[in-house]
């Protein structure tokens, strides 16, 4: 299955609690931290919820 790299590019400070919890659930902490996750519907939904805070790249 394909993998994606998710990078936190904007701070979740001042955002609504559900968005902050989504960032933590993705495994992101500090700015410019990144995680590599499997590309599935659940992860894509989480990315959509915080798309204004993260950038996403395909990983080979």
From Swiss-Prot:
It holds the Pfam family Ribosomal_L30. Gene3D superfamilies: Ribosomal protein L30, ferredoxin-like fold domain (3.30.1390.20). InterPro entries: Ribo_uL30_ferredoxin-like_sf, Ribosomal_uL30_bac-type, Ribosomal_uL30_CS, Ribosomal_uL30_ferredoxin-like. CDD domains: Ribosomal_L30 (cd01658). Keywords: Ribonucleoprotein, Ribosomal protein. One of its GO terms (molecular function) is structural constituent of ribosome. GO terms for cellular component: cytosolic large ribosomal subunit. The keyword Ribosomal protein applies. Disulfide bonds: none annotated. Transmembrane segments: none annotated. Part of the 50S ribosomal subunit. HAMAP family: Ribosomal_uL30_B. Belongs to the universal ribosomal protein uL30 family. This is Large ribosomal subunit protein uL30.
């Amino acid at each position: 299955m394909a993998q994606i790299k998710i990078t936190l590019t904007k701070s979740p400070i001042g955002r609504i609690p559900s968005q902050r919890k989504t960032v933590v659930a993705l495994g992101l902490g500090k700015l410019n931290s990144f995680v590599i996750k499997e590309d599935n519907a659940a992860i894509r939904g989480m990315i959509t919820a915080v798309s204004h805070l993260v950038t996403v790249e395909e990983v080979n």
